[in-house]
A protein has these predicted regions:
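Short glycine-aromatic motifs
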Residues: 2, 28, 110-112
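Generic preference for well-ordered secondary structure
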Residues: 1-4, 17, 38-41, 77, ...
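Terminal substrate-recognition subdomain of acyl/acetyltransferases
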Residues: 32-46, 94-140
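Short linear motifs at secondary-structure transitions and domain/linker junctions
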Residues: 4-10, 18-20, 27-35, 67-72, ...
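Acyl-donor binding region in acyl/amide transferases
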Residues: 52-117
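A conserved beta-strand-loop-helix scaffold within acyl/acetyltransferase catalytic domains
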Residues: 19-60
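Short amphipathic alpha-helix that is part of the acyltransferase structural core
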Residues: 1-25, 130-140
Length: 140
């Protein structure tokens, strides 16, 4: 069973980030994904006057996950992060993880690329009908 949960302590966040090969950022909030109780992924994010910012979305390193576990972990965690950002009253978000290699996943979560090359999503009413915002999940 897939679970996406907020990381409760900075010590835990640092350890999870290390397992996922991303830099621990003390100013970030974070979620982690688990499948059947096993850690699969992390998402670090912030919010500021510009909007929400997903800084890292990464799988645990050196573990072979099924496509299903990988796709579901990243997609559900990305959407959960956007939902939290929206519930906090921040209605735009940016995907800022330059090391993430899955453009299809970024689009599926709901982001589109601006003319300036930034991944952006307008969260106004996004979760009224979230399925309309996916751009087709394609395996990279």
């Amino acid at each position: 069973m897939l679970e996406v949960l907020p990381i409760q302590t900075k010590l835990e966040q640092e350890a999870i980030c290390a397992r996922c090969g991303v830099e621990f950022k003390t100013d970030c909030m974070a979620y982690h994904a688990l499948v059947d109780g096993n850690l699969t992924a992390v998402c670090q994010f912030t919010m500021d006057a510009e909007g929400g910012h997903i800084h890292d979305l990464a799988m645990v390193r050196d573990v072979d996950f099924s496509d299903r576990d990988r796709i579901e972990s990243l997609f559900v965690m990305g959407r959960a992060t956007l939902n939290f950002i929206d519930l906090c009253g921040v209605h735009v978000a940016y995907f800022e993880d330059a090391n993430f290699e899955g453009e299809g996943m970024i689009k599926s979560i709901g982001f589109t690329k601006t003319p300036e090359g930034r991944w952006f999503v307008d969260l106004t009413d996004f979760f009224v009908e979230p399925c309309q915002h996916g751009h087709g999940l394609k395996r990279d």
